[in-house]
From Swiss-Prot:
One of its GO terms (molecular function) is 16S rRNA (adenine(1518)-N(6)/adenine(1519)-N(6))-dimethyltransferase activity. Its main location: cytoplasm. It comes from Rickettsia felis (strain ATCC VR-1525 / URRWXCal2). The gene is rsmA. Specifically dimethylates two adjacent adenosines (A1518 and A1519) in the loop of a conserved hairpin near the 3'-end of 16S rRNA in the 30S particle. May play a critical role in biogenesis of 30S subunits. SUPFAM superfamilies: S-adenosyl-L-methionine-dependent methyltransferases. NCBIfam families: ksgA. Pfam families: RrnaAD. This is Ribosomal RNA small subunit methyltransferase A. Belongs to the class I-like SAM-binding methyltransferase superfamily. rRNA adenine N(6)-methyltransferase family. RsmA subfamily. Signal peptide: none annotated. InterPro entries: KsgA/Erm, rRNA_Ade_diMease-like_C, rRNA_Ade_Mease_Trfase_CS, rRNA_Ade_methylase_Trfase_N, rRNA_adenine_dimethylase, SAM-dependent_MTases_sf.
Length: 239
C-alpha cells in the first residue's frame, strides 16, 4: 500500500524547488475533486504535466484510465513516480521538459489532459495545446486564478483579451472552482482556479488560429492604444 502523498514525498526528501515552479498538493480530497471536474471516463488516455509528488496522479489512476502519461522534468520525482507505477502498470513516465513535446509526438488519437500546471509555463502550454485541439477530448487545468478569469472573460470586460479570444474560438470554457493558497505547500502568493476547456466539434484550422493569434497579439498589445494603430504593423494599409 502506498503511503500518504506527504509521507511519500518526505521519504524521498523531495522539497519544492522554485526553479521548477513547484507548489505541491498533499490533499487527496482536492485531487479527487479536480478529477471529478474532468468527468473522466474509464479507459480514457490521459496526460498530466508536472506530476511532482503524485497526488493528482493517484486520483487519476483510481479512475482506471487506459493509460496515464506523466511528463516530469524534476529527476528527484522519478523514483517516487516509479513506485506509484508498481501499483498502476498503466502509468507511463517521461522525464522531459513539457515545452519540448507535442501531443503528436506521444501518438495520441484522442487524449484527456488533467494537470496542475507549473504557472510559469501554463499559458504557453495552453496556447500550444489549442493548436492540437483535434487530438484533445477535454482539458481540466489548474492555473493562476487571474489566468483562468482571462480565459473565461466576456467581451467588454476588463479581463477580456488575447487569451480569452483564442481559447473561446477553439473551445467551450468553464471555470470550475477556486483553490486557496493554503491548499499548497508552500502556499503561493495568489489564488488558483480550475478551468475546463472542451474543444469544439469543428475547431478552426491551425492557419486561422495562427492568424488570430497574430492579430490579437497586436490588438491587445496596449490597452491604451487604438486597435487601428496596433494593427498597422500587420495591415499597413488599414484606415
Amino acid at each position: 500500500m502506498l503511503p500518504s502523498i506527504a509521507k511519500h514525498a518526505a521519504s524521498h526528501q523531495i522539497n519544492p524547488l522554485k526553479k521548477h515552479g513547484q507548489n505541491f498538493i498533499f490533499d487527496s480530497s482536492l485531487c479527487d475533486k479536480i478529477v471529478r471536474a474532468s468527468n473522466l471516463a474509464e479507459n480514457s488516455r490521459v496526460l498530466e504535466i508536472g506530476p511532482g509528488t503524485g497526488g493528482l496522479t493517484r486520483s487519476i489512476l483510481q479512475k482506471n484510465p487506459a493509460s496515464l502519461t506523466v511528463i516530469e522534468t524534476d529527476e528527484r520525482c522519478i523514483p517516487l513516480l516509479n513506485e506509484i507505477k508498481e501499483y498502476y502498470p498503466n502509468l507511463n513516465i517521461i522525464k522531459q521538459d513539457a515545452l519540448k513535446i507535442n501531443l503528436t509526438d506521444l501518438g495520441y488519437d484522442k487524449v484527456t489532459i488533467i494537470s496542475n500546471l507549473p504557472y510559469h509555463i501554463g499559458t504557453e502550454l495552453v496556447i500550444r495545446w489549442l493548436k492540437e485541439a483535434r487530438l484533445i477530448t477535454n482539458m481540466t487545468l489548474m492555473l493562476q486564478k487571474e489566468v483562468v478569469e482571462r480565459i473565461c472573460a466576456m467581451p467588454s470586460t476588463k479581463a477580456y483579451g488575447r487569451l480569452s479570444v483564442i481559447c473561446q474560438l477553439i473551445t467551450k470554457v468553464e471555470k470550475c472552482f477556486d483553490v486557496a493558497p493554503t491548499a499548497f505547500y508552500p502556499p503561493p502568493k495568489v489564488y488558483s482556479a480550475i478551468v475546463k476547456l472542451i474543444p469544439l466539434e469543428n475547431p478552426p484550422s491551425i492557419a486561422l488560429i495562427n492568424k488570430v493569434e497574430q492579430i490579437t497579439k497586436l490588438a491587445f498589445a496596449g490597452r491604451r492604444k487604438m486597435i487601428k494603430s496596433s494593427l498597422k504593423n500587420l495591415v499597413p494599409n488599414i484606415h
